[in-house]
A protein has these predicted regions:
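Short, contiguous alpha-helical
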Residues: 2-4, 14, 18-22, 29, ...
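Hydrophobic alpha-helical core bundles mediating ligand binding, dimerization, or RNAP-core interactions
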Residues: 17, 21, 25-28, 32, ...
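Acidic/histidine-rich alpha-helical segments that form the ligand environment
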Residues: 87-128, 142-147
Length: 171
């Protein structure tokens, strides 16, 4: 007997992008659930702490918004300098875990609203601003794909951090 696989109902491109964008975001939040302020700042070598991941992902999504939505940044220059790159810092200082999660959610919500209004023809648009360091971010469709992959990539690293800290990975 041969099994028949039915095709899924067609999905709009916008729904596809929103699903992918929300999936990685939700996974990061799920991985952060059982951290507290102290454990969110711990990271055995060679890992980065959870607060860095949250700040880094916030910076990248915020940067996308400034490039393609023309919005003002939701993060300060100091915040961006601290979390956008890979430098090691004194992670014992900085916003609380709750503040970091709230900012990550706010940046996601702002971009989600923008993505929900996109049409397929919008994906070919170019940012009027010059991207810093990565020309692939100039095109809206490419930048959107990169930001989704970026969150998913770091989600895997947060999973590795959890294992290094003796925590269970929930998925």
């Amino acid at each position: 007997m041969t099994a028949t696989i039915e095709a899924a109902p067609p999905q709009s491109l916008t729904d596809h992008f929103l699903h992918s964008f929300d999936l990685a975001h939700g996974m990061v939040l799920q991985l952060a659930e059982d951290f507290d302020d102290a454990s969110a700042r711990l990271a055995p070598a060679p890992h980065k702490p959870l607060v860095w991941f949250l700040g880094h992902l916030t910076c990248s999504t915020d940067y996308f918004s400034t490039l393609h939505q023309g919005t003002e940044s939701l993060v300060t220059e100091e915040f961006s300098r601290r979390y956008a790159g890979n430098d090691n810092q004194d992670w014992s200082i900085g916003p609380s875990l709750e503040e970091m999660i709230d900012l990550y959610k706010a940046v996601h919500a702002r971009m989600r609203e923008f993505v929900a209004g996109l049409t397929p023809s919008d994906l070919d648009k170019e940012s009027p601003l010059e991207p810093f360091g990565d020309d692939r971010l100039k095109n809206l469709g490419k930048a959107l794909a990169i930001i989704q992959m970026h969150d998913a990539y770091h989600c895997g690293q947060v999973g590795c951090l959890r294992v290094a800290l003796g925590k269970h990975v929930p998925f």
